[in-house]
Amino acid sequence: MSIDVTDYRDIFLNDRPLMDARAPVEFHKGAFPGAVNLPLMNDIERQRVGTCYKHHGQQAAIELGHQLVSGPVKEERIQAWAEFARTHPEGYLYCFRGGLRSQIVQQWLKSEAGVDYPRIGGGYKALRGFLIDTLESALTDCDFVLLGGMTGTGKTEVLAQLRNSVDLEGHANHRGSSFGKRATGQPSNIDFENRLAIDLLKKRAAGIDQFVLEDESRVVGSCALPLPLYQGMQQYPMVWLEDRFEQRVERILRDYVVDLSAEFQAVHGEEGFGRFCERLLESLDNVHKRLGGERHRRMRVLMEEALAEQGRSGAVELHRAWIEGLLREYYDPMYVFQREKKGGRIEFAGERQAVIEYLRQRGKSQA
């Protein structure tokens, strides 16, 4: 039988294939990038075994588990495990604590399918603990600088040009603003934290110890930043990205209208454009109170007209009206206030190429 593996660093640095034997409800609460959920027990079976354990003890629970996962059900699951193991011979299996469930899966794979497959010592809990420690050590040992700038300046594009950037919005699958929802959902908060920690782990392994982050609020959509990170972001130095108003309008038009509507149609097919319209109007309604009734009504009329024209002809030019209005009357005044508030921390300000060069040079000088 294979020895339990505890080199968690290797597992994440090399993207080892992972077979997660926990129940689906556990998996959806939090898992690791690329892990595949092939449970020993489904949610109902797990609940029944848990209730039995509570009232009748471990042995009775084990016996019930073997009754529930037997015959064709057992054969089907072993077949799925064996297929995964043969397809991914460099992978591992795990359960919550590296206990009975992964042990049973490992034993059945060996006895029923002739497959000897290693499991992770400590299971999900140990892997998760390793990533929490990874994040905490990065925050303690590394330097961070924030990238700020008004809406539409292309901060995400700048991050993509830097090898030492950490894309919080990418990990959260959200653009970070009130209009930031994507056509696909966001990860669970645990998944978000895991992705962030693995990103930092890989970059540190490549010799990077200074990171560039976009200046974000505590919550990116539904994903909350780890509190120690957010607290640090209140003190980190900042670089401010600038761009012409016209360029910002065009970038927002591309990102939040052209690309997002295409994304919705790719995901939802014929219903995609309708869902995109609903999402855009919902995003505007979410800032109703901050806009005020009159401004909200005016912007909504402009947005509805633009969406109607886009639906009829595919033309997107009318969207510029509400984009310009939102920037001038809502976002820009808010960002001007924020820049004044954070002015003492801004060590450089400039347009895209100047900011990229500054951040690259900054990384070299502090390496």
Curated annotation (Swiss-Prot):
Its EC number is 2.9.1.3. Keywords: Selenium, Transferase. GO terms for biological process: tRNA wobble uridine modification. Gene3D superfamilies: Rhodanese-like domain. InterPro entries: Rhodanese-like_dom, Rhodanese-like_dom_sf, SelU. One of its GO terms (molecular function) is transferase activity, transferring alkyl or aryl (other than methyl) groups. Residues 12-136 form the Rhodanese domain. The active site is at C95 (s-selanylcysteine intermediate). Disulfide bonds: none annotated. It catalyses: 5-methylaminomethyl-2-thiouridine(34) in tRNA + selenophosphate + (2E)-geranyl diphosphate + H2O + H(+) = 5-methylaminomethyl-2-selenouridine(34) in tRNA + (2E)-thiogeraniol + phosphate + diphosphate; 5-methylaminomethyl-2-thiouridine(34) in tRNA + (2E)-geranyl diphosphate = 5-methylaminomethyl-S-(2E)-geranyl-thiouridine(34) in tRNA + diphosphate; 5-methylaminomethyl-S-(2E)-geranyl-thiouridine(34) in tRNA + selenophosphate + H(+) = 5-methylaminomethyl-2-(Se-phospho)selenouridine(34) in tRNA + (2E)-thiogeraniol; 5-methylaminomethyl-2-(Se-phospho)selenouridine(34) in tRNA + H2O = 5-methylaminomethyl-2-selenouridine(34) in tRNA + phosphate. SMART domains: RHOD (SM00450). Monomer. Belongs to the SelU family. This is tRNA 2-selenouridine synthase. It comes from Pseudomonas fluorescens (strain Pf0-1).
